[in-house]
Amino acid sequence: KGKAGELEFARLCRSNGFDAVRRTAQYCGKTGNASDCVGLPGIHIEVKRVERLSIDDALNQSRRDAEAAHDGSLPIVAHRRNHTRWKITMMQ
């Protein structure tokens, strides 16, 4: 569900006026610690479209990847289960 979730989240962002949001792997190729989606400056986006999620593990992954990018971006996790709305969780 990774690719499908990333595409779905990017479409949601664009439909809400964030026109620059794209799936990283589709837009510029997936590189190690890259955000799952790009186009929200200063935010490192980890997308999880799963039924069972450890939010702490996902936040830690986003934090590690954001720190490795050395750009000062804020780590967030965009997540949802089937038949639910998207949620955003961030760690500061």
Residue ranges: model-predicted function:
Residues 1-92:
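Catalytic phosphate/metal-binding cores of nucleic-acid and nucleotide-processing enzymes, i.e., regions
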